[in-house]
Structure formats: structure tokens, C-alpha cells
């Protein structure tokens, strides 16, 4: 699994509440994977941040997939995202997949009550990190 990250406005930079990250996911790979969330104010384990994804797909006629879901299933949406689409992530896990043949770029903007990015992996998929 491959992705390239550029922290534009990390926690260490001066700002009031925003965190900004660019991510390039080459075709055939996943990002925000294993699925993670940051919707609970439970520091130091997890911070509460809403997030937006602004997607760019190359070539532009392509698509990618994004799923946003919660542990209790109250939110479970899987979207085919296209070039210039925006996805709002108010809560929950939010993995992104770039299918073969289509590179994916996205701009993440996150904000919350505390400007700290601590995420929690989905326990069902945590085994991937431990391999």
C-alpha cells in the first residue's frame, strides 16, 4: 500500500484550528488505510476533528472510492468520487481507494476543538498494522 503525504499546515505550524494535508495515492492503492477515525475527544488516544476531502483524479475521467462509516452503523456510505468532488467526513472511519489506472490526489482540511491529530484505527482491521 503506497501513498505520498505532504503536510501543508501540520500541528507544529502556527494556526488557530486548521490542519491541512495533501495526499497522492498511486493507482491500485489505498489511503486512510487501515480505516481510521478521529471523532472522539479522548486525548491522548484520539482527537475530535471533522474533515473534508477535495479529490482530483488523473486521468480526470476516472473515479475513486471512499467509504465513511461508524462502529454502530448509524453512518455507512460508500461513494464513487470523481475529479473535483468534495467529501465531508463529520465522524467515522473514512478509507479511500484508487482503482487501477487512476492516480488520486486529495486535499484534506481538518478542524476541531483542539488542533491535535490523533486517530484510532478500526479494530477489525488493526491486524494489518501489526504485520
Question: What label would you give each PLM region?
Answer:
Residues 36, 55, 65-67, 95-100, ...:
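Short beta-strand His + acidic residue motifs that chelate non-heme Fe in jelly-roll/DSBH
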Residues 22-25, 45-72, 80, 88, ...:
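Short, conserved beta-strand element in jelly-roll/cupin
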Residues 1-14, 107-131:
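Double-stranded beta-helix
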Residues 60, 93-94, 111-114:
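Short, glycine-/Ser/Thr-/acidic-enriched flexible segments
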Residues 80-101:
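Conserved metal-binding segment of the jelly-roll/cupin
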Residues 18-21, 29-38, 43-44, 64-68:
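A short secondary-structure junction signal
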Residues 1-33:
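Surface-exposed beta-loop interaction hotspot
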